[in-house]
Amino acid sequence: MNKILVIILFSLVSLTWGTTWIAMKIATETIPPFFATGMRFLVASPILIILAYFTKTPLLFPYGQRWFQLIISIFYFSIPFALMLYGGMYVSSSVASIIFSSMPVAVLTVSFLYLKKKLFLTQKIGMFISLITLLTILLIELESQCFFQWKGILALLFALFSHAFIYSECQKKCLNVSVITFNALPSLLSGILLSTTSWFIESPHINTFSNRSILAIFYLGDFSGIFGILSYFYLQQKVSAFYASTVFLIFPVIAGFLENYIYKNAILLCEIWFIFPLIIGILLTLIPVNYLKKIRNKITRLSCLLF
C-alpha cells in the first residue's frame, strides 16, 4: 500500500509541475505577468489559511525568525514567481522547465559558494557537468531565436537562484516550519504586493482577460500552488530526498510534450542530445551524502590495507 501511495504521489507531483509551465504560458496570453502572479497567490492564500486553521498550524514563523518570513515573501514568492511568468512569455515551456530542473544543482552551487559547504568530488563533477550543459543548451536556444529571448532566460535564471538562495538560507538557519506556515502568509503578502504594483506598472484591463487565462490562474493557484506543493512535501516524508528529487528529471519531459501538443513547438534535436549529460550531472549532485561517506570510508579502509 505504501509503494502504491508513493507511486501516486510521484506521478501527481510530476504531472502537476510539468503542467505548471504550460499553465503559466496560457495565463500570460491575456494577463500581464505581475498581475497574473499576484492573482495566483490571492487565489491560493485563503485556502492555505483555512487549512492552517483546521489543522491548528501557526501562520507566523517562530519568534525571532519572523523577519525572515517577510524576506521569503519577497525573494521566494513575489520576485521569482513573477519572473517565471515574465520569462515564460519569451522562452518556451520546455526550455523554462529545463532551467528549473537544475534546481538541485543551483542549491548545491549556492551552498558551496555562499555557505562554504564541503562537497564530495562526485558532487563537484555533477555540478560542473550540469552548469556547463545548461549554459550550452541556453546558448543554442538563444542563437536559434536570434537572441530574442535573452530577457526571459535572465529572468528565469534569477528566479532559479533566488529560490536556491532562500532554500540555502533555510538550511543555514535550520528553519523547521510546516509547509502550510511557509506558504500561507507569504502567499497572501505577495498577492497583495504584486497585484497593487501591477496596477501602476502594467495597468491590467480585466475585460481583455480570456476565460482560459483566468482558468490557468485558478489552476496555478489552487491545484499547482497548493496540491502540488503539499504532495511533494508529503512525498519527501515517504521516500528519501534522492528519490523525491528525481521528479526534477521527469516534469520537463511532460512540459515539452504538452508544449509540442498545444503550441506545436518542438525542442531542437541538438538540445535533446545535451539533455542526457544534464540528467547525469543532476543525478550526481543528488546522490545522498551518507552514501558518498560510506564509499569514502570503504576506499580509505582499502587504501590502509593495501599500503
From Swiss-Prot:
Naturally occurring in which organism (per UniProt): Buchnera aphidicola subsp. Acyrthosiphon pisum (strain APS) (Acyrthosiphon pisum symbiotic bacterium)
Chief location of this protein within or outside the cell: membrane
Lineage top rank: taxon: Bacteria
Membrane-topology annotation of the record: Multi-pass membrane protein
Keyword presence, Iron: no
Family: Belongs to the EamA transporter family.
Name under which the protein is recorded: Uncharacterized transporter BU281
Any single Gene Ontology cellular-component annotation: plasma membrane
Domain EamA: 15-139, 161-287
Subcellular location, record wording: Cell membrane
Transmembrane segments: 4-24, 41-61, 71-91, 95-115, 120-140, 146-166, 174-194, 214-234, 239-259, 267-287
Key words of the record: Cell membrane, Membrane, Repeat, Transmembrane, Transmembrane helix, Transport
Keyword Transport in annotation: yes
UniProt-listed PANTHER family: INNER MEMBRANE TRANSPORTER, PROTEIN PAGO
InterPro entries named among the record's database cross-references: AA-Vitamin_Transporters (IPR050638), EamA_dom (IPR000620)
